Amino acid sequence: PQRQIKILMITTPNLNRVFIRKLQKVCRHLNFANGQVLIQDYNESFYYYALSQQPETFLHDVVLFDYTESDMMSCCLHRNLHTTPQVITLEQKNNGKLLDQKDEQFKNIAEQIIAGQVVSSVYLIGDGFDGDWMKTSLQYLCHTRKVFLGKNLYSKGACYAGFIKDEKRDWPFVYIGDNELKLNLYLKVLIRNEMQFFTLITAGESWFDAVGECEVILDGTPEIEVWIQRPESREAHVELLELTDMVERERRTTRLRITAVPESDCKVKITIRDLGFGEIA
């Protein structure tokens, strides 16, 4: 029964908005609560799996070779050690089919992918790696690197993701993929007489699911400052939103609800609603 399920993780090769909406509709029909079902693609599952292993396995870059289908796919995980949190990027490539002399072909592909990089570990997944055909290619991969062979990496990565997201475990990484938000949005607000930044949107979250909302009391001029920061940068720029056609009231008697809803991975729609006079519920 779904009431016994704390988090349901779903991982799939690719995501799009139509698929997400249909899946969310099915989950609502099955009485899953909002936030109980989390969806991610295979790339994100690889990211969570690789960085949930022992630190020495991702001291440098990590490479995945996926031979599940007829084509040999590769994915390289890179960490930016100069950002906080560390920004993770994945470089994916379709290397085509392995025909005759598979061992030599795969060795050539591996050499091209790894060239110029320091790689700590390599993961080999998919039925295509079955059999005893890897000889020189495996010897090359195992030189100064850890190599792992298996078939359930994506499902395990989804489980790691569910644990990390649900338990709010310390996670010093942020993954910026095709479906992840490429910006942070903040509001500068006064909380208990202390000026703080309130996070509306967080980079690295899936733009399909992310939403930010808060209620504030307007103090002073009718305008809102939105601070926008790219995850790879320590600098932020400010967008000033002027609130026009508002009812004039005395200072600190205007209550606003601010809602941020992503429209893509790099575009966010902000709606500001005048709630009138009163206390914040």
Write out the residue ranges for each language-model feature.
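Glycine-rich phosphate-binding/hydrolytic loop that grips phosphoryl groups
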Residues: 38-55, 147-190
